Curated annotation (Swiss-Prot):
<dbReference type="InterPro" id="IPR035992">
    <property type="entry name" value="Ricin_B-like_lectins"/>
</dbReference>
<protein>
    <recommendedName>
        <fullName>Ricin B-like lectin R40C1</fullName>
    </recommendedName>
</protein>
<keyword id="KW-0430">Lectin</keyword>
<dbReference type="InterPro" id="IPR040249">
    <property type="entry name" value="Ricin_B-like_lectin_EULS3-like"/>
</dbReference>
<dbReference type="GO" id="GO:0030246">
    <property type="term" value="F:carbohydrate binding"/>
</dbReference>
<feature type="region of interest" description="Disordered">
    <location>
        <begin position="1"/>
        <end position="26"/>
    </location>
</feature>
<feature type="domain" description="Ricin B-type lectin">
    <location>
        <begin position="199"/>
        <end position="345"/>
    </location>
</feature>
<comment type="function">
    <text>Lectin which binds carbohydrates in vitro. Interacts through its lectin domain with glycan structures containing specific motifs.</text>
</comment>
Amino acid sequence: MFGFGHHGHHGQDQPPQHHGGGGGGAHQPTFKIFCRADEGYCVAVREGNVVLAPTNPRDEHQHWYKDMRFSAKIKDEEGNPAFALVNKATGLAIKHSLGQGHPVKLAPFNPEYPDESVLWTESGDVGKSFRCIRMLNNIRLNFDAFHGDKDHGGVHDGTTIVLWEWAKGDNQCWKILPWGDEAYAGGSANAPRGGNEPTVRIFCKADEGFSVTVRGGSVCLAPTNPRDEYQHWIKDMRHSNSIKDEEGYPAFALVNRVTGEAIKHSQGEGHPVKLVPYNPGYQDESVLWTESRDVGHGFRCIRMVNNIYLNFDALHGDKDHGGVRDGTTVALWKWCEGDNQRWKIVPW
């Protein structure tokens, strides 16, 4: 796996299995990059250029690594974590262009050197889970499928990827998603494990029609939608044998499928839980949780491994406060026997 920075533990001693050309990195997830203008085309390398091509999972030039190794310490001006996009077939990273209207470039990727010219960030959701991909150090210049909007005839085989200021075009709205069976089911290069890791849904008894999701960098509840990848979580049990809570229940992390971030303890009672980049190789109790005994109908409390008195709480999601709604914050609270504190973590 890539080494991932986390709380000063930067994992630089864990170079990627793939470096340079060739089809290495078999255990790393690879991603497809596509835009809303035509989801049947993916970003590819062709003759040294970055273009769109008809989606083909067997074309390794359409497979990209999303390298998050610098994400903990390098952010854009909005606080979004930096990543590099490294082509599986060539080992080259997508590099900033000369400016607006110019095609993005390709450059050799040095995993030991934080070169800002190959670092990108994703914006907030700009509709249906699409996001802008923009320069780390100039978030006003975004990936743009050149003339890929309807007014210019749409995307075609060979459409160039350039940078352009935000014009609200479908050709500027992107998703970076894992390839299918050949990729880890998770959505980030700092995912907990290789292989097809099953994802889980997290919901509370107050309203089982809502599931825990990531939105705008926060953990909240949203109407349940299996197609919304942000509602998919990996329950990583890798430390469960060695770390238990005071009642003996095993510890786990909850890692978002899309962002690769783990839910982190809040600052205290009443504060929202947080998200941080997940480093599977580093034992960090601040991202570890346990489940209580059954508190009725198979529901359980989800609580801090090192303070089981603070539980997941759908803030003001009890009947007295109007119930769960779209956007209800997940905070920590002492046990009050509320339905908004009783949770299930079940497979999708």
